[in-house]
Amino acid sequence: MLNLLLLSLSVCLLYVFITAFWNLYIHPLHHIPGPRQWIAFPILRHLSAIRGTLDSDLRRWHFRYGSAVRFGPDEASFITAEAWKDIYGSTRPQLPRVISSGSNTSDIINANDANHARYRKALAHAFSTNGVRDQEPLVIDYIVKLVGRLKEVAESKLPTDMVKWYKLTTFDMIGDLAFGEHFGGLEKSEYHHWVATVGRFTRIIPFLKIMDAYPVLFKVFLAVMPQSFWKAQAEQAEYTKLTVQKRLNSSIAQDRPDFMDSMLRHRNEKDKLSEHELESNASVLVLAGSETPADLLSGVTYWLLKTPEALEKATGEVRSLMKAESEITFSSVEARLPYLLACVNEGLRLYPSLPGELQRMSPDTPMKISGYDIPPRTRVSVHQYAAYSSPTNFHDPDRFIPERWLPEAKTNPSSPYLFDNREVFQPFSVGPRGCIGKSLAYPLMRTIIARVLWNFDFDLCEESRSWHIQKTFGLWEKPPLICKLTQRKQS
């Protein structure tokens, strides 16, 4: 018996050794540099993801190895503008998304190309120029509610968590646009159970990616998962189903300028969305359209407070050019507040809403990405956090410098930011699967920041001085951003 165990152990060790040797020295991807331990033993890459350090590790690997990094046997990450075009562009047939077997393929993020085109067509009106214009009054109503609640906080003179206020606002707002009713977060000053479940679920994302690579390990993980998590997931799904059904049966179903109205415009066509697809897409729109803007709003607020000169310029611009709060609208912010727009871009650069990679699978034939030969069936991606913080792409990359986005920085020969690689900055991705919500997200975020700065002076509390040091689990794991607010004294 002992001999059999020793033989089995020896065979396992030999297999591990041979596999590691193959991955390091023979594998067709061996010409791309990267951390040798991760390449030899891919479980280390997954452990990094489970710990929440994968994105900061990849940032470090790119700083060490350059514009292309191999971080697993068949995984490569890039940080060049060319890689965006090669991986996500529309000049060749789309590279398929890499998704885990547990992903919901009935939504616009994880769908195959054919269904993605259907979903995008169904949502096209919602994110068109006319659609965004029609949604603006509803968005402004929620921003007014946020400002009203923050005025109460300022009057109390107590510190407050801006991450929470931004999340309550964006989830109420996008929930209303997707489901036809809000979550009541701003009214109650607390997260609805649907929203709270999202926060708990993000930590599970790395485990889902283990499912296909290490199915036995994943079964162990499932066995130790608390039943309360699965109960919360079921309650979230049931809430989505009931709320969508309520919206479909409502008398305003065809007259309300929201996401569901857009999806229902094609209900009599042969490629209409099923009720399950309506539920899936409404749910993912709430998640993507709420969590990521809240990230950006929190990030911009933090970096402005950490950079007093930028805060002074942005606040001065808003208050000098906007004579009344009601003047702060989608169009006026874009047309009249160039420095604020630069602050939003710089916030997205230092704190991208999706810090990690959107992986694609290379085809069954070799291809080139950013000049590198890539063998078939390789998982490839641009890593946003690493790309935006690389000194090869941006001058002084670790500092919050909105001036780099102003027009003169791109044309003035004496500007230190003249050669910043702005084409690598693609926070909403590119190509046919680029984020459809960009047309709403940008004006929404800019208008919230502008109205908050118009109304309040901020101080960053000591406990949030290092707020930007965070773990990531697909999304940022945001700690509270504790600030003191003072209502602006108007002359």
UniProtKB/Swiss-Prot annotation:
Protein's pathway: Secondary metabolite biosynthesis; terpenoid biosynthesis
Compartment(s) of residence: Membrane
InterPro entries attached to this UniProt entry: Cyt_P450 (IPR001128), Cyt_P450_CS (IPR017972), Cyt_P450_E_grp-I (IPR002401), Cyt_P450_sf (IPR036396), Cytochrome_P450_monoxygenase (IPR050121)
GO cellular component terms, A-Z: membrane
SUPFAM superfamilies: Cytochrome P450
Enzyme Commission number: 1.-.-.-
Result of knocking out the encoding gene: Abolishes the production of 15-deoxyoxalicine B and accumulates decaturin A.
Pfam families linked: p450
Cofactor(s) recorded in Swiss-Prot or TrEMBL: heme
Root EC class: oxidoreductase
Keywords, in A-Z order: Heme, Iron, Membrane, Metal-binding, Monooxygenase, Oxidoreductase, Transmembrane, Transmembrane helix
Transmembrane segments: 5-27
Membrane topology: Single-pass membrane protein
Binding site for heme: 435
Disulfide bonds: none
Record GO terms (molecular function): heme binding; iron ion binding; monooxygenase activity; oxidoreductase activity, acting on paired donors, with incorporation or reduction of molecular oxygen
Superkingdom of the source species: Eukaryota
Note: The 15-deoxyoxalicine B cluster is a rare cluster that contains its own geranylgeranyl pyrophosphate synthase (olcC), in contrast to other related clusters which rely on a FPP/GGPP synthase localized outside of the cluster.
Family statement drawn from the similarity comment of this UniProt entry: Belongs to the cytochrome P450 family.
Role played: Cytochrome P450 monooxygenase; part of the gene cluster that mediates the biosynthesis of 15-deoxyoxalicine B. The first step of the pathway is the synthesis of nicotinyl-CoA from nicotinic acid by the nicotinic acid-CoA ligase olcI. Nicotinyl-CoA is then a substrate of polyketide synthase olcA to produce 4-hydroxy-6-(3-pyridinyl)-2H-pyran-2-one (HPPO) which is further prenylated by the polyprenyl transferase olcH to yield geranylgeranyl-HPPO. Geranylgeranyl pyrophosphate is provided by the cluster-specific geranylgeranyl pyrophosphate synthase olcC.
Protein's recorded name: Cytochrome P450 monooxygenase olcB
Organism (species): Penicillium canescens
Gene from which this protein is expressed: olcB
